[in-house]
UniProtKB/Swiss-Prot annotation:
The protein's name: Archaeosine synthase
InterPro entries listed in its UniProt record: Archaeosine_synthase_1, ArchSynthase1/Queuine_TRR, DUF5591, PUA, PUA-like_sf, PUA_sf, TGT-like_sf, Uncharacterised_CHP00451
EC category: transferase
Family note: Belongs to the archaeosine synthase type 1 family.
PANTHER family on file: ARCHAEOSINE SYNTHASE, QUEUINE TRNA-RIBOSYLTRANSFERASE
Record's catalysed reaction(s): 7-cyano-7-carbaguanosine(15) in tRNA + L-glutamine + H2O = archaeosine(15) in tRNA + L-glutamate
Record SMART domains: PUA
Keywords: Transferase, tRNA processing
GO CC list: cytoplasm
Length: 569
């Protein structure tokens, strides 16, 4: 029914005629219009009582069986029909739908193999913790199947799209217009100076505008911010937003567009980063702690240019570590992977202090495991120093890290500890190779980069294979990740086998797209937009980019799974 084309926790899909979802549904389910679905299968339902609405309810209840009231006692659920199955013709195709009618007893749901799932009690679920059944449904069904949640308010759409809903309706536009309410992006406002038609047209327009914004947000990677903007005005939405634990495979490892950090510190992109940060191995036993900067990557900011120059003047190889919220700790080697904006007040929350100190303690534990002796130099402003829970540190910042006095102090201090690195085989060339290897470890879960490599000014990485210099990867200037070449993909496959991002196929592939008929298996931990290798009978064939997570690929029935970039001849 749908073909996913972009993910940002929520998903952007296209129908067969190229129309994009999330959108207002225009499918005539069981011969009922949107209005009839609202007043029919949605009943009993809390909405304003009036004779006209009662008559609509009574006349539209035509589904085969009695709908289970939301708060039905569990002992009485057996007398109600919990699922309605049928088919519907849409744009020349016949689709199977399932109306899910389980009341508050979400554990009773039994999913059929369908193209469209209709949440009969969505209006009640959205105000309760049971709303989390929707992502659980999404987890079990094909990515080509759609979820429809009837009778939602416009400001509920971003959250519902975020957790996996594809179709909505604007049935509440007419109902609330008839009661004198004007919809805005965030609420319904009682007004007296508008006619029913004016209110109705306005309310319908708000639905369309919200849906358009959601589609744009998914495509450009800022859906979470749209969700927060609308959810924060409604406690029930905010509660369900905070409850939801999204599948991190449905976001890319690094985004080209800036992540906007608001009040919610537990954002998916940060969680994904922190999970992989644990695998980072430090290179030097001289650790220099630095503050973050508003400009990203940090190294192009004026302040970090000064820090880098001061460190270079000391002619000492150090491990530069940036302390920041919400990422906690960012080694210089990984700085291009974090691109964010956060409001700076000069004050830290308890959660931020705890995160930074935990990250730092874990990092220093690894330093100690690798090197018996090490030193931590804090070149930080006062409001950073106040939160550090470290005993043995050398402070060089003298109040203002960018002042000439502080920068000279940093250089002189580093010179004093130069002897620490002499017996450790630490040098600048080795650090550059180490940084690429740690990037590979972070991105692929394995270091497949040889110790003998050459990196040119374009970020292209070469090594000798069969006595020939061959490019194995390049650094993507937009997101800081590695882009594989054929040689690099084969090296990755030979290094990690099926522990890495592999896609198994059943035919001799060509450049283009991989579709489900040619798909055999994959690593289900592949994330959307990941670099992948393609194999057949354990033989390397080519490289590409994942268009959905590996978990979703295994359930897909149609649509492109992988963009095949290059194939071994």
């Amino acid at each position: 029914m749908l073909e996913p084309i972009a993910y940002d926790i929520g998903r952007l899909c296209k129908e067969e005629d190229k129309e994009l979802t999330p959108k207002l549904i225009d499918i005539d389910v069981i011969g009922l219009s949107q209005e009839k679905i609202f007043y029919g299968i949605m009943t009993p339902f809390r909405c304003p009582n009036s004779k006209s609405i009662y008559e609509l309810r009574k006349s539209y209840v035509k589904a085969d069986g009695i709908k289970m009231p939301f708060d039905t006692f569990r002992e009485l659920t057996s007398i109600f029909k919990k699922s309605f199955i049928g088919t519907v013709k849409y744009k020349g195709n016949v689709f199977k739908y399932q109306i899910l009618n389980f009341g508050k007893h979400v554990d009773l749901i039994e999913l059929e193999d369908a193209d469209l799932y209709i949440i009969a009690d969505g209006r009640r679920l959205i105000e309760r913790k049971e709303l989390q059944i929707i992502p659980k449904i999404r987890e079990k069904i094909s990515p080509n199947s759609a979820i429809y949640s009837p009778a939602v308010f416009p400001w509920e759409i971003p959250l519902l799209a975020y957790i996996g809903v594809d179709y909505f309706d604007d049935s509440l536009a007419k109902l609330y217009a008839s009661m004198g309410y004007k919809f805005t992006k965030n609420r319904a406002v009682k007004v007296d100076s508008f006619s029913f038609e004016e209110l109705y047209n306005n309310n319908k327009k708000v639905y369309e505008e919200i849906l358009e914004e959601v589609r744009i947000a998914i495509k450009n990677g800022f859906l979470r911010n749209v969700v927060e903007e609308t959810a924060v005005s409604h406690p029930y939405l905010w509660a369900n937003y905070r409850r939801y634990e999204p599948d991190l495979r449905n976001i890319p490892l690094s985004k080209e567009n800036k992540i906007i950090v608001t009040t919610n510190i537990n954002i998916p992109e940060v969680k994904k980063y922190l999970e992989r940060l644990d695998n980072y191995e430090p290179y030097s036993n001289i650790i220099v702690l630095l503050p973050c900067s508003s400009k990203k990557p940090y190294s192009i900011s004026q302040s970090h240019q000064k820090f880098i120059k001061a460190i270079k003047s000391a002619k000492v190889v150090v491990e530069e570590v940036i302390l920041t919220s919400p990422y906690g700790l960012v080694p210089r080697a990984l700085e291009r992977l974090v691109n964010y904006d956060i409001p700076v007040t000069g004050e830290w929350s308890f959660e931020e202090i705890e995160l930074i100190n935990n990250c730092l303690k874990n990092f220093l534990k690894k330093v100690k495991e690798k090197f018996d002796d090490y030193i931590v130099i804090a070149h930080l402003p006062e409001h950073y120093l106040e939160i550090l829970e470290l005993d043995d540190i050398v402070i060089t910042s003298k109040g203002n890290p960018t002042s000439e006095e502080a920068l000279k102090n940093l250089t002189d201090t580093l010179k004093k500890y130069k002897e620490l690195t002499k017996s450790k085989d630490i040098n600048k060339k080795g650090q550059r190779i180490h940084n690429i290897q740690q990037l590979a470890e972070f991105q692929f879960g394995i270091n497949f980069i040889p110790n003998e490599i050459f990196i040119n000014h374009k970020g292209q990485i070469f090594t000798k294979i069969n006595n020939k210099n061959q490019q194995i990867a390049s650094i993507n200037p937009k997101n800081g990740l590695l882009i594989l070449t054929l040689s690099g993909g084969e090296l990755l496959w030979n290094s990690g086998g099926k522990d890495i991002n592999y896609i198994e196929v059943n035919y001799e592939i060509k450049k283009g797209s991989l579709f489900p008929p040619g798909f055999v298996d994959c690593n289900e931990n592949i994330s959307y937009n990941d670099e992948v290798v393609l194999i057949k009978d354990d033989t390397f064939l080519g490289i590409g980019r994942a268009l959905m997570s590996g978990f979703e690929m295994k359930k897909a029935k149609h649509g492109a799974l992988v963009n095949i970039r290059n194939v071994k001849s």
